[in-house]
Regions:
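Bacterial N-terminal signal peptides that target proteins for export
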Residues: 4-20
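C-terminal motif of bacterial Sec signal peptides marking the signal peptidase cleavage site
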Residues: 30-31
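Calycin-type beta-barrel ligand-binding domains and close structural analogs
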Residues: 38-69, 94-236
Length: 236
């Protein structure tokens, strides 16, 4: 009889080999799962980048509210165009929000950028502009943004949105306790909840700011989402 078997080293070696092979197999499975998840996130990000650019309006929502006797959502138009600047990254956009009945009344100007963050989630970062008038109506002349640099931006720190696939679209939300946007009644809110939804021809946005007592300072208490429908695609 083989003495190595009598003294157990043979069986110990086999057991050790099995453990090593098992660990290697588990590592391969984890790596494969991670790779699949990363690939899925890349495909989701690419899909969002195709859907997002364009011109949107929520006039239909406004009219439906009026017809139903509800407090109407303000009628707004939103234009979103890509920013062609290597400094801004491959997934950067200019967003301008205007009154639907008067495009000269501009309410919001932002630069939004997208990336797959360290956690593997799709992250949207939001920034306002140091000189809003310089970039006003930039959606009409997108070449203007080739001159944009990071110093032109004021990041909304803590207000990143994290996106995930949901049904036939995507949903995004921030971490409210980290986001402290200024409101009309106070310099900074204790928490701000940002929510967004994106489908191939639809975009929904809401912003609700609360004070330290939980009282709503800005935004709608009921039906907070402004629901926009795409009126035209952005032409590359």
């Amino acid at each position: 009889m083989d003495k190595s078997r009598d003294g157990h080293p043979y069986w110990h070696a086999r057991a050790w080999l099995c453990l090593v092979l098992g660990a290697l197999a588990a590592s391969v499975l984890v790596a494969c799962a991670s790779s699949r998840k990363e690939k899925t996130q890349e495909l989701d990000l690419a899909q969002m980048m195709r859907w997002l650019p364009g011109t949107y309006s929520n006039v239909a929502q406004h009219e439906a509210d009026v017809k139903a006797g509800k407090p109407p959502h303000e009628a707004l138009d939103i234009a979103i165009v890509p920013i062609d600047s290597p400094i801004m990254g491959p997934h950067a956009f200019y967003l301008q929000e205007m009154a639907a009945d008067d495009p000269r009344r501009v309410m919001v100007q932002q630069v939004i950028t997208f990336e797959i963050g360290p956690s593997g989630k799709i992250k949207e970062s939001v920034a306002t502009l140091v000189e809003p008038r310089r970039w006003r109506d930039g959606q009409l002349t997108p070449e203007l943004f080739t001159a944009m640099v990071v110093e032109d931006l004021v990041p909304m720190s803590g207000c990143d949105l994290f996106w995930k696939r949901s049904g036939d679209g995507f949903v995004g939300a921030d971490e409210p306790l980290r986001c402290h946007t200024a409101s009309h009644t106070s310099e900074a809110a204790a928490r701000t909840q940002l929510v967004a939804e994106l489908k191939s021809t639809e975009l929904a946005l809401s912003e609700q700011s609360y004070d330290s007592s939980g009282v709503l300072m800005q935004g709608r208490a009921e039906d907070p989402l402004y629901r926009f429908r795409k009126s035209n695609e952005h032409k590359q």
